Structure formats: structure tokens, C-alpha cells
Amino acid sequence: MLHSASEILKQLDSGEVTAVEVIAQSLAAIRASQPTINAFTHVAEETAMQAAEAVDADRKAGKTLGPLAGLPVAIKDVLCTSDMPTTCSSKMLEGFVPPYDATVVARLKSAGAIVVGKTNMDEFAMGASTETSAMGVTGNPWDTTKTPGGSSGGAAAAVAAGAVPLSLGTDTGGSIRQPAAFCGITGLKPTYGRVSRYGLVAFASSLDQAGPMGWSVDDVAIGLQAMAGYDPRDSTSVNAEVPDFTPAMAAEDVRGMRIGVLREGLDQDGISPAVRDALATAESVFREQGAEIVEVELPHSKYWVPTYYVIAPCEASSNLSRFDGAHYGYRVADAEIAAADSGPLEAMYSLSRAGGFGSEVKRRIMVGTYALSEGYYDAYYNQALKVRRLIRNDYDAAFQQVDLMLGPVTPSPAFALNEKTDDPIAMYLCDLFTVGANLAGVPAISLPGGFDAVGLPVGVQLQAPVMEETRLLRAGNVFQMASDFHTRRPPTFTANHSQ
């Protein structure tokens, strides 16, 4: 059975299992779950088994191995991989294989991890349900009629279904934390700049950040240790020393920590009682473990969502302008170009983009282009940047008073597939509690925090000051030692490992 990443690594080190056995189990679980979950856009069976055989041979020969040697991992299909397609779950990039690995992928491989495949996502990471994918909808392993969240829905579902113990997602406005909450796993969005964005196909460059997803805080700490660090190829990478995150896992309590509870937005319509209950439970657990619990406010939190949905589409409009049919990706047939009323170059651009992008991507490009246009730049984009500064100031002020902030991840547990697809505003409000961390650039972690009346997972969120991932990991690990929410598995996981 595929357990947590930390358990598998111990078994590999002790010789209890071989890398070939672990990878074979992972691939078998993918095959079993793919028809109902559809977590993967590409499965690398042959190369994964070859890599596993190489790890076992090196171990037998007594060679020095990387800290993740033999561990199966899955990569969100927005991160470049030189040996398999990177499609961003879009027709625009269908079949595209990059000539290089993203830095985070290269670092995981260098640490010995074995990439078993690429995971499904909302197209170009734009969505909160993995329903905008051109590769089909992904189901939630707890209930396949529900969404796994988005945009890293496939990465979260792959862990929850037992296909891999560790996956790599990206978070622009909550895209690691929301799927982690919906799928009952742990997901970490690092500080902006802590992890390289080189090789990450950009959605919103000032917001995007890659991070690990696994069952426990211990697992995501292992992943973060391998992928974090300065990268000169990324101009936004922070040249700061990466601490050893292991001591954070040894903490037995949170004595001396002051944790501020965020309640903004909890009184709105549509907030599930299970979300409030999970937050109350987390408060109680942290108080019992020695933390001082206080109230904290972020005065401009009501502007998080509107600010995000100006800045992110503006950056997307710019970033996605490179996909034009000329150099790579989808290109409309020459016959259609010749039949168009406009000139051939304009026809190639417009028809290729119209055919290659899905409706949600087109919507955000249009919104961003409008907000950046000459008559509206100051009223929308420039104004949003000013509000973003106020939001960052709110965080700075709050962290003068507290060590961490505790709050919800999502307004509700996982909602039904197709429930919000025709209502973009309802879908955007799924980001109500998560986009603040992206706008401020601070690290945040989603922890399994409970279950609703029908057994769907509910998450809780911790946020920390810039570059204080160690603080997050310490508190999160203490919470998980004092609770068992992260140890529960969905029916799909049990079915995949019943043999």
C-alpha cells in the first residue's frame, strides 16, 4: 500500500521495499483510478519503471542516493517536463513537449524522485474546479460527483486516490490550498520567490508559486526541502538561504506562539457550518497545544477578490499573448486561414487563439485586455495595484501582533460538478479566503480540519510572514499530531489498495 511520502522513504531506506515495487504500485493505482478520477493527463509508465530500476541498482551498488530516491511524484501539467508533454490542459498546447525541465522538476529528479506522470488542471490554471480542462473533468476521490477543486485538482486527486504520495501543484489564488482542502490532504503555498518559477507556464507572474501536496505536513516539508532555493534563471527568485525544515517536525507543541484568528467573511451567506466548525476545532487544538489565540483583522480583506480578479486577468492577457499559432502549439489549418476575410497573419493569430483557448481562458484574457486598455488602465489595473499595497500593509501590521494567522480555506466543502460552471462570479468566490496570501506574497498551508455531515473533507488554513515556512510547518505538524483528520482515506484510496 502506498502510504505517506515519509513512510515510503523509510521503507525504501530499510530495504523493506524496492523502488520497482513502489513505482509498480503507483502505476497500478493510477490505472485503477484513472477511469473514474481522471487525475492524469499523461502517465510515464516506461520511463518511471526504468528510473526505478536504476535507483535499485544504485542502492544495491552502495552508491550515494538523493533524499527522495525511488519516491513516485506527480507534476501538475503547467510545469515543463522535457520527457513528456506539457499541455496546461489546453488544446492550445496539446502534444507539446518542452526542451527542458522546470527548475522545480529538475530539483525533484536530482533528489531522486521519480515522475510517474502529469496531472490534470483547469486550463492554463484558470479555474477552481478542474472543469475547464480540455482533457476532461477530474473527480474527487471522496465522491466522484464532486469537484476536487482547482486549478491543481488533478494533483490533489492523485494523492487522495493513492496514486502518488507527493505531487507538485501551483498556487496563483488558492490553487494548491483549495484542492487540498476539498480532497482532504495537505497543501503548501510557499513564499513568493522561495521556489523557482523557471519553467512554470505563467498565468499571473506576480502571483504564481509552485508548492508540494501530500497527506501530511511531514510530506510537504520533504517536498519543499527538495524544491526550494534561489534560481538565477528566475528574476523573481529570492536569494535567501533555505533552512533545514526537519527541526520543525520535531516540535511537540506551539508554546509561545501567538495565533490570530481571521473571521472576516465567515458571516456571509453561503459559508458552510462545517467550515465554521473546523475553524473552531482548530482553535481549540492550538489552544490545548500551548498557543495564545487572539482575534486579528485585515481591514481590506473585502477587496481581496476584486483586486485579484483585476490583476490576475491583466497579467494573463499579457502572458498568453505569446500563444499565437506561429511557433508552437495549436495552429488552425492553412485552408481556414486562406478562406478568412482578413490577411493571412491576422487570420492565423485570431483563428488559432479562438480554436485553441477554452471559454474561461478567453473570458480572462478579454477582462485583462479591457482593464489594460488606454481609457481604463488607471481606473482598474493601476487602482488594483494600489489596493494590493494596502493589503500587503494589512499583513505586515497583523504579523507585528501575531506569529501566525488561522482561518478557513474555502467557503464550503467540495461542491458538485457543473454546479458553478455557468456562474463565473460564484466560481470566483471560491477564492474568498485564499487570494490574500497571493496578493501579499506570504506562505500559507491548508490542513485537513474536519468533515461535513456527509463525510466530505474540510480544510483550515495557516498563514505566516514572508520566508517563515518553518513556522507554518511546526504549527501544522503539531496540529496533525493532535488530530487525525489527515490520516483518513477516501473510498477510492481503499479500493485502489485493497489487494
Swiss-Prot record:
GO biological process: one example: translation
InterPro entries: Amidase, Amidase_CS, Amidase_dom, AS_sf, GatA
Active site: 76, 151, 175
Keywords, ordered alphabetically: ATP-binding, Ligase, Nucleotide-binding, Protein biosynthesis
Any one GO CC term of the record: glutamyl-tRNA(Gln) amidotransferase complex
Enzyme class of the recorded protein, top EC level: ligase
EC number: 6.3.5.7
Pfam family, one: Amidase
GO MF annotation terms: ATP binding; glutaminyl-tRNA synthase (glutamine-hydrolyzing) activity
Catalytic activity: L-glutamyl-tRNA(Gln) + L-glutamine + ATP + H2O = L-glutaminyl-tRNA(Gln) + L-glutamate + ADP + phosphate + H(+)
Biological role: Allows the formation of correctly charged Gln-tRNA(Gln) through the transamidation of misacylated Glu-tRNA(Gln) in organisms which lack glutaminyl-tRNA synthetase. The reaction takes place in the presence of glutamine and ATP through an activated gamma-phospho-Glu-tRNA(Gln).
Subunit structure: Heterotrimer of A, B and C subunits.
Family to which this protein belongs: Belongs to the amidase family. GatA subfamily.
Protein name: Glutamyl-tRNA(Gln) amidotransferase subunit A
Organism: Rhodopirellula baltica (strain DSM 10527 / NCIMB 13988 / SH1)
Gene this protein is translated from: gatA
